[in-house]
Amino acid sequence: MRLHHKSLCHILCGGAVVIATHPASAAFVEDSKASIDLRNFYMNRDFRSGTGQSKAEEWAQGFMLKMESGYTEGPIGFGVDAIGLLGVKLDSSPDRVGTGILQSDREAPNRAQDDYGSAGVTAKAKLSATTLHVGTLQPILPVVMRNDSRLLPQTYRGAWLQSKEIDGLTLDLGKLDRVNQRNSSDNEEMTAFNGGRRNIQFGSQTSSDEFLFAGARYAWSPELSTSYFYGGLDGIYKEHNFGLVHVLPLGDKQSFKTDLRYVHQTDDGGSNVDADAFGAMFTYKLGGHAFGAGYQQLNGDTGFAYIAGSDNSLVNLVQINDFGNEDERSWHVRYDYDFAAMGIPGLSLMTRYLSGDNVDRGPGASEGKTWERNTDLAYVFQSGPLKNLGLRLRNATTRSNFGSDLDENRFIVSYSLPLW
């Protein structure tokens, strides 16, 4: 659905009318909240190799209006949430399109639309510690993770049941039938990403209107948690996803975190998906410092499959790559610093380096190799008239003997304004 500038006001006013006229409890109104998030996004991607377009460079302003009601009284409480998304082009041209922050013009695909957006409503119900959401969803689960790395977030349409009746145990069950990509106004069927050297092939079915998921997460203690999830894109692929996270307190502002992940994927009748992914990330924290090291390995006849446009659960998913190609092995070193330790709360730095090899490039070809370097510098104002204003600079460089060589910069200014 195309969302024009006035639609944000219509959504907010409509939501306010629903709350104000609902005959139910005070909690429905008193527990409601609304906010508008502003995101100004500049992105420059320099294509260092190949012919054709030399770079992608665009600038845009995003508006995200969110409204959440409380629940009505009674054994089963009911409520409604709403979201309105609008992206406005500030700068683009036909020779610089393709950053992913703007939607392509429907009549001229080599141009970006002046604006784009969508609106969504979610009905919800709550019984004890169990909730059901039906409508627009933004899941962040091991088998399906909405992507929010550009101007506007990716959203899904479906139903999601979550239960926390047992202390420490979270159960999830759901079905998705449509996805609205981060630079789109349309709810569409889902497909699996098959770029890079994943060597994923489809039969006659290339998309699906059914993604089923179910899983459990259990916190055995404040230090240890485990998870299992099943996810399946009907007719294309299915996966079993296992995770373990342990944090060992070492005293004196020190800790050691272990993050282990294993995913087994197979086809579901309409593809050749066959992959096993193992990942491990270890992080030592000392005061404001964090030192991380990780390893990831892919085995099987294909690379890692996931819903196109989304994020995934690979430990080496970073700014540009996820190192999930067929047979790829990759390692990862990372350093973070929280400047609150120096008396500058809100300022943070992250830098990391990843290297991958052993990628299957086909019969007779040498192994594929790639590396990527990321640096993030971010600051959020903690007080004063600019409180909650965030500034973030993201830089990435990647080189490969089977893909594109890229240099990338993103500058993001964000601000969240509570409305009530």
Describe each region flagged by the PLM.
Residues 27, 69-71, 124-127, 163-165, ...:
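Residue-level signature of outer-membrane beta-barrel architecture
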Residues 27-44, 74-80:
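Transmembrane beta-strand segments of Gram-negative outer membrane beta-barrel proteins
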Residues 30, 55-63, 115-119, 153-157, ...:
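Residues that define the transmembrane beta-barrel architecture of outer-membrane proteins
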Residues 34, 75-78, 129-133, 168-172, ...:
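Repeated loop/turn-to-beta-strand initiation elements of outer-membrane beta-barrel proteins
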Residues 38-42, 132-146, 171-173, 214, ...:
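Transmembrane beta-strand segments that form the barrel wall of outer-membrane beta-barrel proteins
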Residues 67-100, 109-189, 216-224, 293-301:
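Outer membrane beta-barrel
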Residues 88-90, 172-207, 253-330, 395-411:
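Outer-membrane beta-barrel translocator/channel fold
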Residues 196, 214, 333, 375-381, ...:
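Outer-membrane beta-barrel "beta-signal"
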